[in-house]
Amino acid sequence: MNPQLNKLTLPIYMDYQATTPIDPRVMEAMLPYFTTKFGNPHSRSHSFGWEAENAVEEARSMVAKLIGADTKEIIFTSGATESNNLAIKGIAKFYSNKKNHIITVVSEHKCVLDACRHLEQEGIKITYLPIKPNGIIDLETLKNAITDQTMLVSVMVVNNEIGVVQPLKEIGKICREKGVFFHSDIAQGFGKIPIDVNEFNIDLASISGHKIYGPKGIGALYVRKKPRVRVTPLINGGGQERGMRSGTLPTPLIVGLGMAAEIAYSEMEKDTKHVNYLFDRFLNNIHKRISEVYLNGDKNQRYKGNVNLSFAGVEGESIILAIKDLAVSSGSACTSASLEPSYVLRSMGIGEELAHTAIRFGIGRFTTEQEVDYAVNLICSKIDKLRELSPLWEMMQEGIDLKKIKWAVH
């Protein structure tokens, strides 16, 4: 028995894009607001309310600092899905009497695409920009898609499935020159890569707590004040959050998001070094041991905590079953229950066979070198076994083009 394995806790968590474990420091900061500091932050007549309000405002400033925003520009929501809906539908509803066109990208998160499809039914025209084979948009195509009717461009910073980083600074520059609002779903990049809303000319940005070692059920929407961006609220009520998002604020969750943002701000460089080192170790060791493994998405223009790999000649589902000691996913967590190949990979022009073999491995703050080495050994031995059993792999080795095969119907 390898004594090293005694120290490993199985299964190993490698699904950091789906969610992250809460940082113990975040948990510690939240606990008092569940017990003794339980006041409603909107109660202005006593110290319980003032205490909660102070905690909320401190957290708001921590979130703002991480993206170079003003504290007043941060609106708390239940998460990035709500933030994306509020940004896209809120802009569309407020400005629809002036303009009727929105531009987004085929590889956006499902909630952005669904919000856009919903608006299409209401008569808003949507352009879905294609992506290049490396997963990144073409800036000229974006420029040409903008018309005098365009009110919003929505492009995420880090793709949740393949980890590529879109050129936000250039996109923001184009939008500002053309007088179009720029929204970005920054859930996968917030606290992981440097994002400055002013440098990138971002007008709206969606944030999620549980992607940065904070609690689930809390997020934020950055809404620019100068030049002012107006959104019609989705939720009406007491007029909290500058009238954009009514409802009593969940103080413990907000404190957790604030603390997670504060830690990310002070430890981003350390986290990045750690993740980049493990990415290189993981990828290089897999490539050394097995052939025909493809990294999906641009190798350099990416967040390296996301490693999406296609293993030719085997099915993604059979890989997941074979490596059940690793918590990984095929596609995004929201759609990984369906057996359809990933729409993101298909939109990059990756064939159905290869798209079906894709697995997303996530590396994060708490991933260890030992876990990565264990994962590499497990993956390589299981892929070898699965390929031995795979008639498709055998045919590929004989040089048969699988695309040209006509399968008989039984």
Swiss-Prot record:
Signal peptide: none annotated. One of its GO terms (molecular function) is 2 iron, 2 sulfur cluster binding. It is found in: Cytoplasm. The modification N6-(pyridoxal phosphate)lysine is found at residue 211. It catalyses: (sulfur carrier)-H + L-cysteine = (sulfur carrier)-SH + L-alanine. Its cofactor is pyridoxal 5'-phosphate. The active site is at 334 (cysteine persulfide intermediate). This is Cysteine desulfurase IscS. It is an enzyme of class 2 (transferase). InterPro entries: Aminotrans_V_dom, Aminotrans_V_PyrdxlP_BS, Cys_deSase_IscS, Cysteine_dSase, PyrdxlP-dep_Trfase, PyrdxlP-dep_Trfase_major, PyrdxlP-dep_Trfase_small. [2Fe-2S] cluster binds at residue 334. Belongs to the class-V pyridoxal-phosphate-dependent aminotransferase family. NifS/IscS subfamily. NCBIfam families: IscS, PRK02948.1, PRK14012.1. Homodimer. Forms a heterotetramer with IscU, interacts with other sulfur acceptors. Keywords: 2Fe-2S, Cytoplasm, Iron, Iron-sulfur, Metal-binding, Pyridoxal phosphate, Transferase. Its EC number is 2.8.1.7. It comes from Rickettsia massiliae (strain Mtu5). GO terms for cellular component: L-cysteine desulfurase complex. Pathway: Cofactor biosynthesis; iron-sulfur cluster biosynthesis. Gene3D superfamilies: Aspartate Aminotransferase, domain 1 (3.90.1150.10), Type I PLP-dependent aspartate aminotransferase-like (Major domain) (3.40.640.10). GO terms for biological process: [2Fe-2S] cluster assembly. The gene is iscS. Pyridoxal 5'-phosphate binds at residues 80-81, 160, 188, 208-210, 248. It comes from the Bacteria. Master enzyme that delivers sulfur to a number of partners involved in Fe-S cluster assembly, tRNA modification or cofactor biosynthesis. Catalyzes the removal of elemental sulfur atoms from cysteine to produce alanine. Functions as a sulfur delivery protein for Fe-S cluster synthesis onto IscU, an Fe-S scaffold assembly protein, as well as other S acceptor proteins.
